[in-house]
Design a protein with these regions (language model features):
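Charge-rich, low-complexity segments
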Residues: 1-82, 89, 98-104, 131
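Helical (often loop-to-helix) elements that flank the catalytic cores of nucleotide-handling enzymes
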Residues: 101-116
């Protein structure tokens, strides 16, 4: 089952700083499939500019590595990227996956060619996609 590649984009604010929110549209069939029951957040801190947004160079790096990871996770049907929050010196990628262990395995495999990255990953069971 393929995820839509249609997204909405919104500007918001968090802790007085600008926040860019991207959310994936038309995921009902994937949500209702019961396959992706674990909510997984990957948080990637960056230096940012004076407003807490990534610099152009940081944006290129975040986009490149995020796309590599998203493609691998979705090709292997291990996780679906559902939302991205960028601001306050961190990029937060929200996924729904089959398991935290499988997600971690693919992250390690995908990023093995790079120096250690300052990412943090958290996961929780959320079969109804309520978070």
């Amino acid at each position: 089952m393929q995820a839509s590649n249609e997204w909405f984009v919104a500007d918001a604010e968090s802790e007085g700083m600008p926040l860019i929110v991207r959310g994936r549209l038309f995921l009902d069939a994937l949500r209702q499939s019961g396959r992706y029951t674990t909510r997984i957040a990957l948080v990637w801190p960056y230096g940012g500019d004076g407003k807490g947004l990534p610099t152009d160079k940081e944006t290129r790096g975040l986009d490149l590595l995020n796309e590599q990871l998203r493609q691998k996770l979705e090709d292997e049907e291990a996780a679906i990227l559902t939302a991205i929050f960028i601001g306050n010196r961190a990029a937060r990628y929200e996924y729904y996956g089959t398991s935290a262990e499988e997600f971690g395995r693919i992250v390690e495999e995908t990023f093995a060619q790079y120096p250690p990255l300052p990412i943090r990953i958290g996961a929780e069971s959320d079969p109804e996609w309520k978070s």
